[in-house]
Structures are given as C-alpha cells and as structure tokens.
A protein has these predicted regions:
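Short amphipathic alpha-helical segments, especially helix-boundary/capping motifs
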Residues: 2, 142-145
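Acidic/His-rich structured neighborhood in mature extracellular/periplasmic domains
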Residues: 3-131, 148, 154
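Short, well-ordered coil↔helix boundary/capping segments
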Residues: 11, 15, 144, 158-162
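Short alpha-helix capping/helix-loop boundary micro-motifs
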Residues: 131-143
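C-terminal soluble interaction/assembly domains
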Residues: 140, 148-167
Length: 167
C-alpha cells in the first residue's frame, strides 16, 4: 500500500490470487464460528495471513506460499495433502527470492535489517523436500487427482528461489 508500516490491508473490491484465497478462507472461518461481522472477518484474515497469527511487521506476513501452507496447517486451518496423492513427486525447495531480489520489494529495498530478518525466515526453507504434481501428470480428471470442493491449488515455478507463482 506504499507505507512503511505493516498493517492489515483489506480490499474486497480488488484481490490477487493469494488474497482471494485468504479472503474466502477468512470468510469461511468466520462463518464456521457463527460470526458474520467485519471485525470477525478481519481477525480471521490476520490469523491466516501472518506467521503464528500475529502481525509483527512486514516479515511476519507469510510471503512464500509454502510457508503460508505450513503455518496455516500448524494452526489447524488447512491440511497439505499433495503428498497423499498418487501422482505427487518430491523436490527440494530453497527459498531466497525475496532477499536476493530485495530491490523489487518496497519494504526490503535499502533496509538491511529487514533483509536479514527475511534471510532468517528463508533459511528455514533451505533443502526442504516438498511435494507437487508434475504438469505431465495433469492430463487426468479432477476425480483421478482427488481434487475436492474447496481445495487450494498452487502453481509451482522453476524460478530460482521461489516456490509458487499462482494460487
């Protein structure tokens, strides 16, 4: 949003692929607990969007989707099931795109302290095995893939240091 302060940004009228997933999930969580007010939605969104559900600056946001999935699985919000699917294979993940391309990120640019914090987060994602379904296996039906209503699908990338380019 152009400011240096990290705050929960909510735009229901314009979303990207990840914020769409977060928005729908937050609305679903609020509804699950019988809450339909905007504050309950924002509370659920904050829980989903930030590491351990706590907003503590820019690097507390779950910028990498693999990190987002792991954190939200630990909170009991989602379940990573790719590895359970018969077509899944494993690859080694090494996340470092944000720290190695810090000039592309307003909050990281010219901020060595914040880059160091991001490097610490990325370090936890060095040589981590993750499951994915190769493109060559996607010529089967959604039933064969065992995709269920409400599943979140992420499109992986071969861009060095990055995990996902679309959800």
């Amino acid at each position: 949003d152009g400011t240096d302060e990290e705050r929960l940004v909510v735009h229901l009228d314009k979303v990207d692929c990840t914020t769409l997933v977060e928005t729908v999930l937050a609305l679903s969580l609020a509804d699950k607990y019988g809450k339909s007010d905007f504050e309950s939605y924002k509370k659920a969104l904050l829980c989903i969007r930030y590491r351990n559900g706590k907003q503590a600056g820019y690097v507390s946001r779950l910028h990498y989707f693999s990190d987002w999935i792991k954190d939200n699985e630990q909170k009991g919000i989602v379940h990573e099931r790719t590895g359970e699917l018969g077509l899944a294979v494993s690859q080694i993940l090494n996340l470092d795109f944000m720290s190695t391309h810090s000039d592309n990120y307003h909050r990281l640019k010219n901020n060595p302290s914040m880059i160091s914090q991001m490097i610490e987060i990325e370090r936890k994602w060095k040589n981590v095995p993750v499951s994915y379904i190769p493109k060559t296996s996607l010529n089967v039906s959604s039933e064969e893939l065992d995709i269920k209503n409400g599943d979140i699908i992420a499109i992986t990338t071969n861009i060095k240091g990055l995990d996902v380019v679309h959800t």
